[in-house]
Amino acid sequence: MNKQEQERRAKLMRMQAERLPEIKRRFEENQNRSHFENTEEKPVETGAAVIFEQAQKRNFNSNFKPGGKDFRGKKSDRANGVNGANGTNNSDNQKSRNNRQNKNNKKRGNQGNAAENNPAVNDNDSRKVNLSVSTRRGEMVHHQRMLSQDVNAQATQHIIGVPVNKSRFNGYNGAQVTNAQLKAARPDPEAVRVIPIGGVGEFGIGKNMTVIEYKNEMIVIDMGVLFASEDYPGVNYMIPDIKYLEDNLSKVKAILFTHAHLDHIGACKHLLPKFGPLTPIYATDFTIGMIKRQMSEIDDLPELNYNVVDPFKHEKIQVSEHLSVEFVHMLHSIPGNCGLVIRTPNGVIYLSGDWRAEANPIDRQSDLERLDEIVKHEGISLMLNESTNIDSPGHHPHSEYDVGDNIGKVMDHYANGRVIISCFSSQINRIGMILEQAYRRGRKVAFAGFSMINNIEVALRAKCIKVPKDTVMKMEDIIKLPDDKVTIVCTGSQGELNAVLNRMVTGAHKFIKIKASDTIVFSSNPIPGNEPHVVNTVDGLLREGAQVIQNGKTHLTNIGPLHLSGHAYYEDHVDFVTRLQPLNYLPYHGEFFMMEHNAEMAENVVGISHDRILVADDGDIVELLPNKTIRKNGRISVGNKLYDDADKPVHEAVVKDRIHISREGIFMIVLTISKKTGRLIKTPDIVSRAFIYLDNSEELIGKIRHYLRVKTDKSISTEPEVKVLKEEVKEDITRILFDATGHTPIVIPVINKV
């Protein structure tokens, strides 16, 4: 034992001796606390101690220090068998650990402790090895359990089993339905079944997909994606799991699409090929064009049965023996948007799709007159009404023309520089207004962004947009013009890292670099969750000296609005549902709170009877019975498929590992053992990623290397011995790392035989 180590141990013993009176006093206080257990008044000064005692029982690693001293005792005290909380000895625990170690040694054929077999390991080394095996096992297990719970909760936000739904509109009088009840459910053979496969009551807006089923006939409506949040590292989007449909492919008689937003068509390239060329696909011209654009991304493009529908012809499409469909034009933020009138043996089902009310639209007004005729002559037995914007009070306040006029004001007010407008690439009518405003002022327009250019091409083919003569130029040509003649329309309004606008900010764009004379217009609102990314982009623009104008901040520039929501406001819903007078009401397309508020509106304002309103979840089976009442009756299995940026599937287990790594990191140990002798032939290699920086952790790494030398100080030749060694190293290193850092990275021991 060297001098430094002797001094350290002596200091440790002095500290323990100094603490003994304090430890004894606290132990007596703990013993006396029971006198107050059955009284109404407890001493105030014991409150902190009681809380800390509870934390101790749960193995919390608290830093609270009553009286200015560590209530748990120093790590060195605990390592030497002294519990700082009450002064008791941990000899029993030490015996238990020794017994476990002896058992492990016997498994490996070890006839004693590694230190005994290695003369180079003295008593001091043995003590170090014992320290390597954590005496904070309870804390570590608690940490791992809480981490596992957090990781599972984060990775399974969209995993759908039997969702908790105790809403008074849940169809079970507010009681939570059980698995046993669902298994016992038997459908009415004459019922029309409405089954949301995705997009209903989930965490986020998207993944819309609904099935209408009658006996052996099914209609599938929409196939959308839901873009993943940052809680899902490496996952770009998710789509519905359609196992139920794959098990019933012969029953699917038609696939219908309400419109071309990605939350309604984004899963087409993954799902449509499963149905083959015989299943007819119905949608408007623009929507079909956008679906074909999606399908063109597939290497082996399948043959599909596309059918273009003109909603203004009021055509009744007989898709099966008992089911027919009529597309009804509804105003939205994209051309070709429709609601669906589905005629069934049990009455008319109206599915609204996405819609908004607008007094003076660019697009044709919603075909409410046709819906009035249907209500008058047939009635609506069940209405599925979207819920997205139900929390916005009043009526939709503006028109797309207002947005166009305000974009013109920007061009007038900032006439001497370039105007760069960022919006959603699907905002075809908005883009048309920008072209018109630029044409009036003698400005030229260039488009930037892959999706932007593709969508405009589809719109031109479907005759959904008019381009003024000699207004559009290529990007490489427009940069040659004076700044006051340049308008650029680009993607990136959501602060996407690799979108055009961000690349302009960072100087990574091939043609455009932001400069102080530029004016950037955000003709959009941040999608919930994207706000930090938008702020980051705005900061970058302002740092370059550019003028930034955002929708919703009219008080800063006196220019606005610059964007419209594509969804109806609260009073618009009241008017619409009142107009259609549905017998039964099923909110859909929205998060749970949106659907709940939608249901409350239908009951409290419109006056629909409570027992005719249901709030469903993905997978719930809603039956429309022959007597035109509705009920929930069981569930089907639903879920999600996850995909990355390359459109490749990502397994849930991989997501969990990524989350764990992002929080705790990876620690890899590579042991190289001779095939002949079975002994370690080189210093173990240690690799740390997203955990600790090795150059700053020499003491910890030295301790781990010493542990590994002792642990491998015998011949390891058979595979069972290698397997046991891996497990022991993994467990012990995890404890060592937790003792030193409070974290439990994924420990990967690798044993190479050479």
PLM region descriptions:
Residues 1-179, 183-186:
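Intrinsically disordered, low-complexity RNA-associated tracts
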Residues 3, 719-754:
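C-terminal tails and terminal domains of large nucleic-acid-associated
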Residues 152-256, 261-480, 499-513, 532-536:
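His/Asp/Glu-rich metal-coordinating catalytic cores
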Residues 282, 586-587, 748:
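Short glycine-rich phosphate-binding loop at a beta-alpha junction
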Residues 295, 602, 737:
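Conserved hydrophobic residues forming the short capping helix/wall of the S-adenosyl-L-methionine
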Residues 307-309, 383, 489, 615, ...:
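Extended hydrophobic secondary-structure segments that form protein cores and membrane-embedded regions
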Residues 329, 344, 490-492, 671-675, ...:
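Flexible glycine-/small-residue-rich
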Residues 392, 396-700, 705-719, 726-727, ...:
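Hard-cation-handling environments
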